[in-house]
Amino acid sequence: MSQGQGGITLDDLIAQADYLKRYIDSLQRTQLELLESINSIDSAKQAIETIKSGNKEMLVFIDRKGYLLAKVGGIVGDKVTVHLGLSYYAEVDLDSAIKILDKRKDEISKAAQNLNNELQKAASTYNQIVDILNQIQQAAARRQQGE
């Protein structure tokens, strides 16, 4: 079909499929980051609960991947420093910290759900385009066999 007839070209379909594939990959990377953030919040809340229980020692990761742990002793206190966003932190009591973390987790969970919805739409559109491209390829193969 030509552009003049209101259709799209094969090259347009291929370009759209390529764009959607890259977009889906980007959404999946972002989704993974959001899930990692949720897991980090859960870990932070567990640490607060450990502090609240009166435990004076805790194992903490020294690096992000968990290659090195250190036992930290002498944990005393009823306050922790919580990340509020951007470059802002606040020292708050343990219960307030849990409330802040719960709110942040809810925000991230909503963002993850919205992202998942967008990912499903993009994947559906991508699959439709791939189906069309496969049909075009099969039709071309049949025509070539008929020659």
UniProtKB/Swiss-Prot annotation:
Gene Ontology MF annotations: unfolded protein binding
Cited CDD domains: Prefoldin_alpha (cd00584)
Self-association state and partner proteins as the record states: Heterohexamer of two alpha and four beta subunits.
Family stated for the protein in its record: Belongs to the prefoldin alpha subunit family.
Membrane-crossing residue ranges in chain numbering: none
Organism, scientific name: Saccharolobus islandicus (strain L.S.2.15 / Lassen #1)
Keywords: Chaperone, Cytoplasm
Protein name: Prefoldin subunit alpha
Domain of life per record: Archaea
Purpose of the protein: Molecular chaperone capable of stabilizing a range of proteins. Seems to fulfill an ATP-independent, HSP70-like function in archaeal de novo protein folding.
One CC-aspect GO term: cytoplasm
Cross-referenced NCBIfam families: prefoldin subunit alpha
InterPro entries named in the record: PFD_alpha_archaea, Prefoldin, Prefoldin_subunit_alpha
Record-level GO BP terms: protein folding
Localization annotation: Cytoplasm
Broad class of the protein's primary localization: cytoplasm
Pfam families named among the record's database cross-references: Prefoldin (PF02996)
